[in-house]
Amino acid sequence: DLTKPTENIHLNSYFLDISNSYVSEHNIYLFDQDYEYGNYAPPISSLFGLKGAIGPFVYNSDDLYTSRSITKVSKFKILEDGSISFATQGKVEGKTINQYSFDEHNGQLRLALYDFQGSRIVILDENLKEIGKTLDLAKGETMYSSRFMGDKAYLVTYQTVDPLYVVDLSDPTHPRALGELKIPGYSTYLHPY
């Protein structure tokens, strides 16, 4: 309270490694992009330089690399008196691009994420548990911009031509892509009007 400069101030400190943040009317979300390293299982012949000496080594290429990009989410509640209280933590697969990759709607956190599998929207409940997500869109493309507006999300990915995806979020447990529009060039910023 700036009108009472001699009043004691109570502070809470939290030490986190963050790459982005989002503040809604009632919550503060802090995000940390990370990478979980999985198991790498190279073919035996490449380990020892042997070609066929121990016979063919069969492996499932889907299991070869199990590393993945993740986004860790820390949620803090903004209390009535203006103080902040830690609420919960969670994580989702994929990474975000900027502050427009997040949105809180009806108490649910919505995130636009991408990785090598594609782009997607993931919806988390107030305890940061996943309640819905889209299928991976634009496999092999990078997400360049995203924007949430009410029950819709808009994503722009890029490879050669910029597809603009429209995603219906009216049912948070079953978000779905409504369609895409291919436009030349690429957009790194979407602005509602």
Task: Set out the residue ranges of the language-model regions.
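Beta-sheet-rich non-transmembrane sensory/scaffold domains
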Residues: 1-193
